């Protein structure tokens, strides 16, 4: 998987930088799932969704030993 959010340095807990769930290795969050449903009549606003969707293929992924390989975000 690739790193999104503009940061590509592997941080603590095997995460690739800030704002990036690229390597998918979150040992402290593996079995935790939270769902929140908010119902209302206001229209749903999605700001920046298209930008995040196109950022996916930057070629930054976590390699062996929690290192980013390659790091070219």
Swiss-Prot record:
It comes from the Eukaryota. The keyword Iron does not apply. The keyword Phosphoprotein does not apply. Pfam families: Metallothio_2 (PF01439). One of its GO terms (molecular function) is metal ion binding. InterPro entries: Metalthion_15p. Keywords: Metal-binding, Metal-thiolate cluster. Belongs to the metallothionein superfamily. Type 15 family. Metallothioneins have a high content of cysteine residues that bind various heavy metals. PANTHER family: METALLOTHIONEIN-LIKE PROTEIN 2A, METALLOTHIONEIN-LIKE PROTEIN 4B. This is Metallothionein-like protein type 2.
């Amino acid at each position: 998987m690739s790193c999104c959010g503009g940061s590509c340095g592997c941080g603590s807990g095997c995460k690739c930088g800030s704002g990036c769930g690229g390597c998918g290795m979150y040992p402290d969050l593996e079995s935790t799932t939270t769902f929140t449903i908010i119902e209302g009549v206001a229209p749903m606003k999605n700001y920046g969704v298209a930008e995040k969707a196109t950022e996916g293929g930057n070629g930054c992924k976590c390699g062996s030993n929690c290192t980013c390989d390659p790091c070219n975000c």
